[in-house]
Amino acid sequence: MASEETGVTAPGAQEVANAGVASEAKGKGKGPAQDTHDTEMDEDDEDDTEADEAEQVAEEVEDDGMDEIDSSNVLPSRTRGRKIDFAKAAAEQNLSVDDDEEDDDDDFNDPDAEDDKMDED
């Protein structure tokens, strides 16, 4: 871009010429290479393996807490897809299906009834 006649370059011409070179120097993987090998890590590896082995032994003891299965919790047969007659089951346990509904009604306090009593005073 230099003018051969005067030997003067146009302003910005040098920047344009260097832009191609600069863009090639930028980007992924273009940084200075770094030494990824750390000698301190090699010395610490021996200590870490001893600590890891101690942790593994402690974890094995904790995981081994298997309790015996209570046989009363195990159902004797499959229950999936089984038709259940709740009235029959209640009769076997000497329960009435309607007993629960009657008990609930006795404990109920109607808030509207209390408001009426306050209005009377």
UniProtKB/Swiss-Prot annotation:
**Magnesium is among the record's keywords:** no
Annotated GO CC locations: nucleus
Q: Where is this region: Disordered?
A: 1-121
Q: Which residues form a coiled coil?
A: none
Tell me which domain of life the UniProt entry assigns to the organism this sequence originates from. Answer: Eukaryota
Q: Describe its partners and assembly state.
A: Forms a heterotrimer with H2A.Z-H2B, stabilizing the association of the histone dimer. Also, with a lower affinity, forms a heterotrimer with H2A-H2B.
Record's function text:
Forms a chaperone-bound H2A.Z-H2B complex that acts as a source for SWR1 complex-dependent H2A to H2A.Z histone replacement in chromatin.
Give the UniProt family note: Belongs to the CHZ1 family.
Residue ranges, compositional bias (Acidic residues): 40-70, 97-121
The main location is: nucleus
Q: What is this protein called?
A: Histone H2A.Z-specific chaperone CHZ1
Where is the protein localized? Nucleus
The alphabetical list of record keywords is: Chaperone, Nucleus
